[in-house]
């Protein structure tokens, strides 16, 4: 299953004239790099323009920003650095995000969790990273378990990691694409269950699939999506993410992160149109 990206599997059959659009999110400092950090232990965030994306949950000198350091199918991506096990940094799309004490929370929903068909991203681990070899930037779907946005104790999310889906050592110095579908294993934080709850009563708490979680939380709504690094990642990590995509009730949203168009005026957000040839470049990735 790791041989190909499910998201773009149809690309090979497309004619050159076929196109697919992605919303382009530019750095706040476009055409320069962003580098948001926070030295304290209290989560802090920053809006990425008015795009609905946020640098979020940044603490203990974690770093996140749209940069040209590790470009993906363009001139940028979302770059992360974690200098220690206490550091953390995320980039998040939040439904009607609001600032609460310097960090951002969702005040709305993107739709029913039951209608989430898939989500995906591309990620990169730099070979200079000294944290555990299986670690890579993770992708999360953020949820309100009972669907009532006025009760917040049941908020949390589900996390994708390759190590719980047949992976072992994360590839380095190359872009990797992963797609999360109904049979993909996810583990939880929060949602009124604590950490890594064993909802399917197996001997292992990390083998509940997306479909299992949807059955367990039939009333849940989606608050947003999150990619990031830390905490608990001892030693150092550097890497990036891009091409974050989700499909909810048949509607697909794809986001590409760039520092800015070459020599052009920057719309906000922009729209990138990929030909089939460009799409082939976008998905020429290593899959284990």
Ranges and model annotations:
Residues 82, 123-125, 143-145, 229-231, ...:
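Short beta-strand segments enriched in hydrophobic/aromatic residues
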Residues 23-55, 255-259:
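Extracellular carbohydrate-recognition regions
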Residues 175-264:
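Terminal, low-complexity interaction segments
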Residues 1-19, 270-288:
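C-terminal cell-surface anchoring/sorting signal
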Residues 124-204:
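Extracellular ligand-binding interfaces
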Residues 115-127:
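A short beta-strand element within beta-rich, extracytoplasmic domains
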Residues 79-116:
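Secreted extracellular polysaccharide-interacting domains
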Residues 60-92:
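Short carbohydrate-recognition loop motifs
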């Amino acid at each position: 299953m790791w041989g190909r990206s499910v998201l773009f599997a149809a690309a090979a059959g497309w004619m050159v004239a076929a196109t697919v659009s992605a919303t382009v999110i530019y750095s706040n400092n476009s055409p320069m790099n962003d580098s948001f950090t926070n030295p304290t232990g209290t989560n802090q965030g920053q809006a990425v323009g008015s795009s609905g994306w946020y640098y979020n949950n940044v603490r203990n000198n974690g770093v996140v920003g749209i940069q040209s350091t590790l470009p993906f199918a363009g001139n940028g991506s979302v770059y992360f650095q974690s200098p220690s096990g206490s550091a953390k940094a995320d980039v998040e799309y939040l439904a009607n995000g609001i600032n609460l004490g310097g960090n951002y929370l969702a005040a709305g929903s993107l739709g029913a969790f039951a209608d989430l068909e898939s989500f995906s991203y591309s990620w990169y681990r730099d070979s200079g990273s000294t944290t555990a070899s299986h670690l890579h930037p993770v992708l999360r779907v953020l949820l309100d378990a009972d669907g009532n946005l006025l009760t917040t104790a049941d908020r949390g999310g589900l996390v994708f990691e390759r190590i719980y889906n047949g992976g072992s050592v994360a590839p380095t110095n190359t872009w990797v694409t992963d797609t999360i579908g109904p049979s993909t294993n996810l583990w939880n934080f929060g949602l009124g269950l604590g950490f890594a709850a064993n909802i399917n009563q197996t001997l292992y708490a990390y083998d509940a699939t997306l479909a299992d979680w949807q059955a367990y939380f039939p009333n849940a709504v989606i608050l947003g999506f999150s990619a990031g690094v830390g905490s608990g990642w001892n030693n150092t990590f550097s890497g990036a993410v891009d091409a974050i995509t989700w499909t909810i009730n048949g509607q697909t949203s794809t986001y590409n992160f760039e520092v800015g168009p070459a020599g052009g005026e920057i719309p906000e957000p922009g729209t990138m149109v990929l030909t089939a040839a460009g799409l082939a470049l976008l998905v020429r990735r290593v899959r284990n």
